[in-house]
Swiss-Prot record:
Its EC number is 2.7.7.89, 2.7.7.42. It comes from Mycobacterium ulcerans (strain Agy99). Involved in the regulation of glutamine synthetase GlnA, a key enzyme in the process to assimilate ammonia. When cellular nitrogen levels are high, the C-terminal adenylyl transferase (AT) inactivates GlnA by covalent transfer of an adenylyl group from ATP to specific tyrosine residue of GlnA, thus reducing its activity. Conversely, when nitrogen levels are low, the N-terminal adenylyl removase (AR) activates GlnA by removing the adenylyl group by phosphorolysis, increasing its activity. It is an enzyme of class 2 (transferase). One of its GO terms (molecular function) is [glutamate-ammonia-ligase] adenylyltransferase activity. This is Bifunctional glutamine synthetase adenylyltransferase/adenylyl-removing enzyme. Its cofactor is Mg(2+).
Length: 995
């Protein structure tokens, strides 16, 4: 019979499982160390200490290796571990956190003693002395220099890591991030000093070494260094002679091979520039050539080692330039470019795991601090500090950001840097990448190394995931708030509680200018108008604006966007859903700011079709803007207009739905949700629906009650309407064909149909706040001089006898779009004999087309237009591509039925399939048509009115680039691509036309 032993007789030693050891050999390892032979309290405490190591199995394996090494003095170490809690905390924490430091201890088995007793971090002076003394000692024995200096460096990192990590295992004091980062910089300084001394000995031997100062920049300069980091330096010499250059180069070589990578890439001209310069040479460069980012780098400059007087002279000369960098003409453009570069550096698939460059990551915090320092440091010396933590504190104290916000940002920054330190310690490798979130073992290790404990609802790994999410969200929110909240405080009325007040109006204007606003005073007035009134709206706006303004600052035209947002907010003030949607759905707000800051066309539509804003969000299937089918909109538009007997009300109803659909299409286009071909088809669909609605309304208005229409009417779409390739600024090119009702003469039917067609054109063309609805019938036989409406027989007779080359060419894009469908199809069958004659068009007609094309190129381009950048009539533009396709259709459609197509793009496919033009040349034509169409659409979206000419370099061209879907807002880059694409296409056009 089994009897349970009394508690007093149970073994005290915890089992391997209770200790959390999962390695199959863990039990054997414990026995090998002799830790399972006794069950006294000392051994129990020892084992529980081991269990708290971030990776207890890894720590145990290194302990076994130490025990096996005769140089360790295992008996002494074992006794110390049993009796000294602080040693256990430091050693177990290090061995469970860093495989590399474990290897260092095994290779240097007496170094464990550095973690014993009352351990304190050595001073900067003591570190310098120990490293330089060793450098002097090993200079005579260079063979051992690297090993001994590296071991000294690792020993100091070991001591720091032991103190930094000890609290994860035992109740030991916690070192602050600032202490750890500053001490790492002190170690780096000492290592640089040792490398410099060795370099001087190697290069100069017994001669006096040159006066050389090493300026630390980056994290080392700011004394906020990582455990593993490149050390960025700039060299300053009294004379930039070959000896100084050799000493600097040798110092970099020694340091990089012994301690860490030394990088001089931030020097003037970067890696292409001289390694060493004099103070005067530095001054000349920064006065004349330096970019904004180079001044930003100098924010953290510090004379680290070498000639102290020379280093201070360098700083005294250069730092005043740093604090006036914001006055430079290109400051704003370069700041915006720096922001874009940060975002584009990280591949999308790892962005969520990137501590440094990901959204809500370390670079977001550092960018905020540095930009605000550059903007306001000119007039406030309290901001002349180097480290990110000190800068945020100073900004809070100075009223440039809220004190609480500064404290929160510092806390988030220090947490993210803590994780970065732990990740780097593991293998002493430079990394900023979090483990895969579903890698349970790796996430749990990181959580334990960062001293994150379970809370009852989550284990340590779960707590880390939650904390990361919280910190990233907080940084992202504060990133916007720190830029804009103080601006609101500077203009808010006394009765509106936003936060503390501090920033002057001049400082607010400087900050807005740095964030991309060309009219900062006007922008402040708009902001004041949004928050300076009583009630809930002002309070909600004060909460929303920091985030909205941050998103808006990334748009090409934040000034125009802010004005549009103010107008929209004032117009929608009675709509309760508007502000609550922006508050509760960040995706809607972000997309709206992009649209408002890019386009003049869509905001005007949104003022009268605000419900489209509610579709800026996402559903489970994707963006709501794409849930609407153009065909469904067309049916709804026709049905809505059909409910009214009054033609004006019918057309007003059609305009309302068209307005909403244009707002939807334009929004989706600007947000990159639609391809250009989808945009063209959707715009064509809504135009056709408007034509159908207007035609039906006018037929009803001209038909007596109880009577019947005197004729059937079909509307034939021509040009881009016929090809379903309309753009935002396109008119509707049409022809009308009628068929009199039975008992009605042709003359009566034509007269009645002409009245209907005239009314359609007039009513749709009535001036309106909406984009115009111009109906153009000038492509009909005889142009403006010909009858507006003809019967089928009249068309047949005319085309059989009188058709001119341009009229035949125009028929290539004829397509029945509205009115009587059967009549429209009969018209198309009739004109097929003209546009696709059995034997092809005559050589005279082809010659005439070529002659007209040459005349168009020389005469139709507007006066003053640039032929290289006119999207419609310019070199390689839309007209060039379309005329080329139409010439090939005229020459070959009688033999190739696939060319019986009104679409330019689909006809290009047929041309390639039939090998009428080489496939690579067809690709050039297609690319040019798509590029020009995107650009032409973008011009309307940006300017708000039809135009075909690309603007010159500047903000408007940048906006066109963004609206056209270019991958950034670099208008110059976009324009270069446009010119390249159209130039290549023009060569193909000339080849086809034989010119």
């Amino acid at each position: 019979m089994n009897v349970t032993k009394p508690a007093t007789q149970r073994p005290k030693l915890p089992s391997v499982g209770r200790l959390g050891l999962v390695d199959a050999l863990a039990g054997a390892h414990l026995a090998e160390l002799g830790w399972t032979e006794h069950d006294d309290q000392a051994h129990v405490d020892l084992l529980w200490s081991l269990s708290r190591a971030p990776d207890a199995d890894a720590a145990l394996k290194v302990l076994v290796r130490l025990a096996e090494n005769p140089d360790t003095g295992w008996d002494e170490l074992n006794a110390a571990l049993l009796n000294e809690r602080s040693l256990r905390g430091r050693l177990f924490a290090v061995l469970g956190s860093s495989l590399s430091l474990g290897d260092h201890l095994v290779a240097n088995p007496q170094s464990w003693k550095l973690l014993r007793g009352k351990v304190a971090l050595p001073s900067h002076a003591a570190l310098l002395e120990s490293f330089v003394d060793l450098a002097e000692e090993v200079a005579a024995a260079p063979a051992s220099a690297v090993h001994r200096l590296r071991a000294l460096h690792r020993d100091h990192v070991l001591v720091l890591a032991g103190l930094d990590l000890a609290a994860t295992v035992e109740d030991e004091p916690v070192l602050s991030f600032t202490v750890v980062a500053a001490h790492l910089a002190d170690i780096a300084d000492a290592a640089l000093a040792a490398a410099l001394r060795l370099a001087e000995k190697t290069v100069c031997r017994d001669r006096t070494p040159p006066r050389l100062a090493v300026i630390a920049v980056g994290k080392c300069g700011a004394r906020e260094l990582n455990y593993v980091s490149d050390v960025d330096v700039i060299f300053v010499a009294e004379r930039a002679d070959p000896i100084s250059i050799r000493v600097a180069g040798e110092m970099m070589r020694v340091a990089s091979s012994t301690f860490f990578e030394v990088d001089a890439g931030l020097r003037p001209e970067g890696r292409s520039g001289e390694l060493v310069r004099t103070v005067e040479s530095h001054i000349a460069y920064y006065q004349r050539w330096a970019k904004t980012w180079e001044f930003q780098a100098l924010l953290k400059a510090r004379a680290a080692v070498g000639d102290a007087e020379l280093g201070q002279r360098y700083l005294a000369a250069l730092m005043p330039m740093v604090w006036t960098a914001c006055e430079r003409d290109d400051f704003v453009a370069e700041v915006q470019a720096m922001r874009r570069r940060v975002e584009q550096l990280v591949p999308a698939d790892i962005r969520g795991r990137e501590l440094k460059l990901g959204t809500g990551g370390l670079r977001d915090v550092e960018f905020v601090a540095q930009l605000l320092q550059l903007v306001h440091g000119r007039s406030d010396e309290s901001l002349h500090v180097a480290s990110t933590v000190d800068a945020l504190s100073a900004l809070g104290e100075g009223g440039y950001i809220g004190r609480e916000d500064a404290a929160n940002m510092i806390a988030s920054y220090e947490f993210l840097r803590l994780l970065e330190h732990r990740l780097q310690l593991q293998r002493l490798k430079r990394t900023h990448l979090l483990p895969e979130f579903d890698d349970e073992e790796a996430v749990r290790w990181l959580a334990r190394a960062a001293h994150i404990r379970p809370d009852g609802r989550h284990d340590a790994a779960g707590m880390l995931r939650e904390e990361l999410k919280h910190q990233n969200v907080r940084v992202s929110r504060l990133h916007a708030k720190l830029f804009y909240q103080p601006l609101l405080e500077s203009i808010a009325p006394a009765g509106l509680e936003i936060a503390g007040r501090g920033m002057t109006s001049e400082a607010a204007e400087r900050q807005l200018a740095a964030l991309g606003y060309e009219g900062p005073q006007t922008a402040l007035k708009h902001m004041a108008a949004l928050v300076n009134h009583s009630g809930r709206r002002a309070r909600v706006q004060s909460v929303l604006l920091p985030r909205l303004l941050d998103w808006l600052s990334y748009a090409p035209d934040p000034d125009g966007g802010l004005l549009a947002y103010r107008r929209l907010s004032e117009a929608l003030a009675p709509q309760s859903w508007y502000l609550s949607t922006l508050r509760d759905k960040p995706t809607v707000g972000r997309r709206l700011m992009h649209v408002l800051g890019t386009s003049a066309f869509v905001p005007d539509l949104l003022m009268r079709a605000p419900e489209v804003i509610q579709n800026y969000g996402d559903s489970r299937t994707g963006p709501k803007l794409l849930e609407t089918e153009p065909a469904a909109v067309a049916r709804a538009l026709i049905a809505s207009a059909g409910r009214y007997s009054d033609p004006l009300r019918a057309i007003a109803a059609a305009r309302t739905l068209r307005r909403r659909e244009l707002a939807r299409i334009g929004s989706a286009d600007l947000l990159g949700l639609l391809e250009v071909t989808e945009v063209c088809r959707a715009l064509t669909s809504v135009w056709v629906a408007v034509l159908q609605s207007a035609l039906e309304a006018m037929i009803r208005a001209n038909t007596p009650e109880g009577g019947r229409p005197l004729a059937r009417i079909a509307v034939i779409g021509m040009g881009r309407l016929g090809g379903s390739e309309l753009s935002y600024g396109s008119d509707a090119d049409v022809m009308y064909v009628c068929e009199p009702a039975s008992g009605v003469t042709d003359a009566q039917g034509v007269k009645w149909s002409t009245a209907v067609a005239e009314q359609v054109r007039a009513k749709l063309g009535t001036p309106s706040v909406d984009p115009p609805l111009e109906v153009d019938a000038n492509l009909r036989p005889e142009g403006r001089n010909g009858p507006l409406v003809r019967t089928l027989a009249s068309y047949g007779a005319y085309y059989a006898q009188w058709a001119q080359a341009w009229e035949i060419q125009a028929l290539l894009r004829a397509h029945a779009v509205a009115g009587d469908a059967a009549l429209g199809q009969r018209f198309l069958l009739l004109v097929d004999h003209t546009r696709y004659p059995p034997d092809g068009v005559s050589a005279e007609a082809v010659h005439e087309i070529r002659r007209i094309k040459a005349r168009v190129e020389s005469e139709r381009l507007p006066r003053g237009a640039d032929p290289n950048t006119h999207t419609k009539l310019g070199r390689g533009g839309l007209a060039d591509i379309e005329w080329t396709v139409q010439l090939l259709q005229l020459q070959n459609a009688h033999e190739i039925e696939a060319l019986h197509n009104t679409s330019t793009l689909e006809s290009l496919d047929a041309i390639a399939e039939a090998k009428l033009v080489a496939e690579d040349e067809v690709k050039l034509l297609r690319q040019a048509w798509l590029t020009a169409t995107r650009a032409r659409n973008a011009l309307v979206l940006v300017r708000g009115k039809p135009t075909d000419q690309l603007p010159g370099p500047g903000r408007q061209l940048n906006a066109v680039a963004v609206a056209a879907g270019w991958h950034n807002d670099d208008g110059g880059e976009f324009l270069d691509n446009y010119l390249r694409v159209t130039r290549r296409a023009k060569a193909v056009v000339r080849k086809v036309f034989g010119s």
